[in-house]
From Swiss-Prot:
The organism's place on the tree of life at top rank: Eukaryota
UniProt-recorded name of the protein: Autophagy protein 12-like
Compartments where located: Cytoplasm
Lineage: Eukaryota, Metazoa, Ecdysozoa, Arthropoda, Hexapoda
Cross-link Glycyl lysine isopeptide (Gly-Lys) (interchain with K-132 in APG5) placement: G111
Biased composition (Polar residues): 1-18
Start and end residues of each stretch annotated as Disordered: 1-22
An MF annotation (GO) of this entry: protein tag activity
Single GO BP term: larval midgut cell programmed cell death
Stated role: Required for autophagy.
Amino acid sequence: MAETPESQAALSTSSSTPADKDGSKICILLNATGNVPIIKKRTWTVDPNKTVGWIQTFIHKFLKLDASEQIFLYVNQTFAPAPDQIIKNLYECHGTNGKLVLYYCKNQAWG
């Protein structure tokens, strides 16, 4: 599947787009857990209508993992959201200090 300009722009660094200023995107903080490679840019902005599954796919591609490897996401080190969960809903319920904190790993850690 080829990357489209829309998919490339959907997840960006927190200080790069003017859309951040009008609040149309949600700031997420990605923290590595376990034996997964660390993403140096921890803070990203995401379209609020994206799903957890989309973020998992993005991380998988960004880290250039093998097709057999999985990525698990956890909200605030407590639970694994469903892949079809909308980021906006997670942010409204579990966002702190203007960010949604997500932990990613290659094996199950919590929940």
